[in-house]
UniProtKB/Swiss-Prot annotation:
Source organism phylogeny: Bacteria, Pseudomonadati, Pseudomonadota, Betaproteobacteria, Burkholderiales
GO MF terms held by the record: iron ion binding
Swiss-Prot/TrEMBL keywords: Iron
Protein family per UniProt: Belongs to the Fe(2+)-trafficking protein family.
Domain of life (superkingdom): Bacteria
Name this protein carries in UniProt: Probable Fe(2+)-trafficking protein
Length: 90
């Protein structure tokens, strides 16, 4: 049976992550409070941030920026908006 969590992002019970997605206390908190669905949404947001800001993930400053954005996305007031992004209309 899948592990269920009260997802902090979705505000409801959902299937939890299989393992901590990040090292340290932040990774433990993500594992305990974030669902697979919310993590997948973050991965899309992270990809847009990397691409639109032309981040080089070999650069420690870029990785630190993404870590701050991830924390803001889940536990703060939301990650930075991607400049110029217009969501597709249905």
């Amino acid at each position: 049976m899948a592990r269920m969590v009260k997802c902090i992002k979705l505000g409801r019970e959902a299937e939890g992550l299989d393992f901590p997605p990040y090292p340290g206390p932040l990774g433990k908190r993500l594992w305990e409070e974030v669902s697979k669905e919310a993590w997948a949404d973050w991965m899309k947001q992270q990809t847009m941030l990397v691409n639109e800001n032309r981040l080089n993930l070999a650069d420690a400053r870029a990785r630190q920026y993404l870590a701050r954005q991830m924390e803001k996305h889940f536990f703060g007031d939301g990650a930075d908006a991607v400049q110029g992004y217009v969501p597709p209309s249905a």
